[in-house]
Amino acid sequence: SEQIVPESYVRQCANPSPYNPHFPYSLQFTVNAMGEAPAAPRDAYWKAGSGGHALCVVPSLDLVVWKLGGRDEQYSEKNTGLPEHSTRDDREGWEKLAEDDGEALKKTLEMVCASVVG
């Protein structure tokens, strides 16, 4: 397979910037080196985008997660023509995600990592 993004760039994304030691951030990515998402591996890093989209990378698990958004009725029946599925809160081990997008993204990353490892 062909590597599109240079390896050095990918490696740097996972390392916090030395220019701002108080915030786990590098090349537009939030870095988990200080445990921002405690249940995810420390080598994880992610970037949230508009509309609730996000990209999460966990090199130690050989894992890349692309989270699709869904705010502002983006996937509503009136916009897609498809019936909406009802939500369920009775699944064992599942919790309602936080309203804050940053916290919800961290929880999503932790749950995906747990399912890969577990």
Regions found by a protein language model. Give the residues of each.
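Structured C-terminal helix/loop/strand segments within mature extracytoplasmic catalytic/sensor domains
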Residues: 48-118
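Active-site Gly/Thr loop motif
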Residues: 14-64
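A structural signal for well-ordered alpha-helical scaffolds and beta->alpha junctions
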Residues: 6, 22, 102-105
